[in-house]
Amino acid sequence: MNNLLLVALGGSIGAVFRYLISIFMIQVFGSSFPFGTLLVNVLGSFLMGVIYALGQMSHISPEFKALIGIGLLGALTTFSTFSNETLLLLQEGDWLKATLNVVLNLSLCLFMVYLGQQLVFSRI
C-alpha cells in the first residue's frame, strides 16, 4: 500500500508540472505547435533514462522508483496528449507540423533516455 500512495503522490506532482509547463510554453510560443507536450516528453525521457540507469546499479529504492519513475514521470510525460495533438494537426491539414511532432517526439525522447543512461553509467 505504501508504494501505491507514493505513485499517487508522484503522479499528482507530475500532472501539476505538466500543466504548468504546457501553459508556460503556450504563453512563450503560442499554440500553433505542441511545444509543451514535446518538452515534458523530452524532459521526462531524460529523467527516465537516469532513473533506469540508477536502478540498474541498485542505487535507488523501490519506493523512489514508485514515487519518481512511475508516479511523477508517468504523469509528467504523455503519449495520449501527443497522439491527440498530432491527430488534430492532421485534421487541420497541417501534415508538416504533424510529421514534425511525431519525428521530434520519437527521436528526441529516445535520444534523451539514452543520454540520461549514459550520463549515469559514465559516472561509475
From Swiss-Prot:
Pfam families: CRCB (PF02537)
Subcellular locations according to the entry: Cell inner membrane
Species, as recorded: Shewanella baltica (strain OS155 / ATCC BAA-1091)
A Gene Ontology BP annotation from the UniProt entry: cellular detoxification of fluoride
Principal subcellular localization: membrane
Catalytic reaction equation(s): fluoride(in) = fluoride(out)
Activity regulation field: Na(+) is not transported, but it plays an essential structural role and its presence is essential for fluoride channel function.
Keywords: Cell inner membrane, Cell membrane, Ion channel, Ion transport, Membrane, Metal-binding, Sodium, Transmembrane, Transmembrane helix, Transport
Residue stretches spanning the membrane: 4-24, 35-55, 60-80, 102-122
One Gene Ontology MF term: fluoride channel activity
Name of the coding gene: fluC
Function per UniProt: Fluoride-specific ion channel. Important for reducing fluoride concentration in the cell, thus reducing its toxicity.
UniProt similarity note: Belongs to the fluoride channel Fluc/FEX (TC 1.A.43) family.
GO cellular component: plasma membrane
Name assigned to this protein: Fluoride-specific ion channel FluC
Residues bound to Na(+): G74, T77
